Amino acid sequence: MDAYGADPTGRTDSTPAVKAALRHAKSMHRPVRVVFSKGTYQLYPERAETRELYVSNTVGADQRYRDKRIGLLVEDMHDVTIDGGGAELVYHGLQTAFASIRSANVTFTNFSFEYAAPEVVDASVASTGVTDGHAYRILSIPAGSPYRVDGTHIAWLGETSPATGQPYWSGVDGLQYTQIHDPKAQRTWRGDNPLFNDIAAVTDLGHRRIRIDYTTTARPEDAGLVYQMRLIERTEPGAFIWQSKNVTMRSMNARYLQSFGVVGQFSENISIDRVNFAPDPASGRSTASFADFVQMSGVKGKVSITRSVFDGPHDDPINIHGTYLEVVGRPGPSSLTLAYEHPQTAGFPQFAPGDEVEFTAKRTMTPLADAHAVVTAVDGPSGQDHNKPLTTMTVTFDRPVPAGVEINGTVVENITATPSVVIADNVFRNVPTRGVLVTTRKPVLITGNRFDGMSMASIYVSADAYQWYESGPVADLTIRGNSFTRPTGPVIFVEPTNQVVDPAKPVHHNIKVEHNFFDIGDVTVVDAKSVGGFAFTANTLRRLDTADHPPYSSPLFVFHGSSDIRIAHNHYDKGLNTSVVSD
């Protein structure tokens, strides 16, 4: 990389050199290894590769954000290794760190990446007190969060572009969203932001310390907490894998993911191994992602996520799903008009000729009779331009549309684009949301992981045709040999969105929870709706409280509209409520 002018000293912008090196590698049309020297490389967005792209779970069809800047772009290539050589890549502004587009056998390895000015401000409450009858807080701000005090407000300036002289992003006071981190307790949760209520004065004390005086009299009780504040637009993915096959991320430090996480979209075989998704301890920050860490949407083959750390996201660490498109028209006997229904997802193709689909009734979330067909033609968005409508598509099948299909009452899932999944030997901590979300009909194994202090369900299984439209059912899910410490209940939550619940027609099937350790407070361990075949065996459940505390009241098991439930050979501490509630 240095031969093309990249600067490992970190004094100059290496973007043009990185772009030139990757373009040359592409021109070679053979297996290639692109290598950095050990050092620090600055990467600015102004001269980065730019592509019009539409990405799942981000900004949908919003034309303000259609052009994405990409620091490291592997495009229309095969057999490529990006070897960081232990380098630190520092990204500036709003850009995707790296992407694989229409490529095969791609490995990103052996580097750390960071953003100079994250879109999240981690404001630590250094101290609190009362002076002359009025409360105050003193905030400590990390170095990567420039600011200016304007009267009784704080303007967050988000780093100045050397090209325009303007900040890459900006906001005021609490921005648009807040979550709270307790570094001592090692917990993070979503909540209200009291920092900017009842303000009397704001003073810049220098050295990145700000004093806020209030009109109120009570001393704030949040000294030591960190208010993680951000905007809400997911303008680009942190990293992007699209229409690619056999892509690996290995031995990396992902210190921060700007605007969103790693998105795998309509690709095949994605592996994430030994990736440390966590902030640099020296940075003073506690946030490592603007939203999710890993989002897999419409991926097929195998998704493998192993030996990694997930610490400090602003949404779910791992979410693996497809997309339900709603039937909104029937232009012909063998064709349907389908629509994206959630505003964050649009603009890219969901189907290709040869893909198999399943027709699902929204109210029951179960397949229609004669529910499968094969796609023969698609007229819809390309994912890389806006020449056609971005929220609808017309899909033609190899057979007449089933009689039970209803406009606005049926959704369609691409069941070819569903992966088998292995999530093994990972650590999840400081998570404000769920730990793992997974909805795929292929085999799923979640094993050897440690979930500590999740603020919502540690493992969540949905199938949603009413809000997020994230598909589909699970048919073979094994949760084995994990530890769940200090969880929020329910620890394992199965919640499809079916409005009609019939135990004879469950949405999900064959879920096994075995040989796990649960160290719990007074919470429900399993809350499962519409499951046919649920086994909870050979698990150990221990109370966090000592024996002299009162017994817990929450039932360990709650089932709704489920059948073939087996709970056996588990070990329970005294004082747990081993009731099974079923309706």
Predicted regions and their residues:
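Extracellular beta-strand-rich solenoid/capping regions of secreted or surface-exposed proteins
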Residues: 19-28, 42-81, 90-109, 117-135, ...
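Short glycine/acidic-rich loop motifs that flank beta-strands on beta-rich extracellular proteins
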Residues: 31, 91-97, 117-121, 235-238, ...
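Acidic Gly/Asp/Thr-rich repetitive segments characteristic of extracellular carbohydrate-active
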Residues: 1-35
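Alpha-solenoid helical-repeat scaffolds
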Residues: 190-284, 292-296, 303, 309, ...
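Solenoid scaffold repeats with emphasis on beta-solenoid/beta-helix
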Residues: 34, 72-75, 80, 87, ...
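Small/polar beta-strand repeat architecture
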Residues: 182-234, 369-372, 378-422, 429-430
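Ser/Thr/Gly-rich low-complexity blocks that favor extended beta-strand/coil architectures
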Residues: 91, 115-117, 126, 142-204, ...
